[in-house]
Amino acid sequence: RGAYGNSTNDVRNDYYFYSKGNVIYTGAGHSSISNADEIQLFVNAIVAAANVTAVKPEVSFVKSLNPSAEVENIRYYMTDQKLWTNTDQNTLEKDMDFYINVKDYNMVSADLNQDDLDKQEITMQFYIEDDKGEVQDGSGTNQRLLDITRQIQNITEYGGNESGINVSNDGMFHTRKNNAFGFSVKNIEDYLHNSSNNDYKSSCKIYAKISSTVYLYNVPKKQTVWTSIDLKQRQLFDLD
């Protein structure tokens, strides 16, 4: 509107505003700003440049509690019997430990003022494929996923204190750090049991849902990503 609506796309003599990826080009600010339209254009450029800094975090399952650890996409679990029995533990591991590495570049952005930096955070939730669960929007799968965040109760942090991070009343883990985190799924056999066939699932995925909220000029911007690790069965054979 106004000067913007009258632009003839002449970047030499008129206003312009152009974006490519996370780079904003504008015709204001190259010389002294002398009128309200130029001030508005310059402010809009600053706001737009700040908005594109709200990027999605990068998350992956890894093999150990270390930000430099190798990515882990598949974990094999061992059973010593083909069929499920109610009296014996058939998986060799009662509990299974997992690790995720979270890289959120919003957490280290130099473009944000201190008030915005103080309010930003990362939340974590964990799910496992289970018929008792529900399909989750954004997860990238049509499988039913059961929220096991509260059952996990506590996660450990690379270089953090021994007490770790407890699940909050909202059913999520909260942090403000890029880091590697570890958690344990108790009684993993309960989720690996295929009740319909009285045997074990050949594949069962665990999902991590990571949401990053960053404030840009006091306006929250939320980005959510999902990642998973696939648990696949291997069976020990009785050689006697």
What are these regions (language model features)?
Residues 1-6:
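Acidic, glycine-rich loop-and-strand cores that form catalytic or ligand-binding grooves
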Residues 115-122:
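Short coil-to-beta strand junction motifs in C2/discoidin
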Residues 124-130:
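Conserved aromatic beta-strand anchor motif in extracellular beta-sandwich/beta-rich domains
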Residues 133-153:
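Surface-exposed loop/edge segments in extracytoplasmic proteins
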Residues 156-189:
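Aromatic sugar-binding surface patches on proteins
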Residues 194-218:
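Short, aromatic- and glycine-rich surface loops/edge beta-strands on solvent-exposed regions
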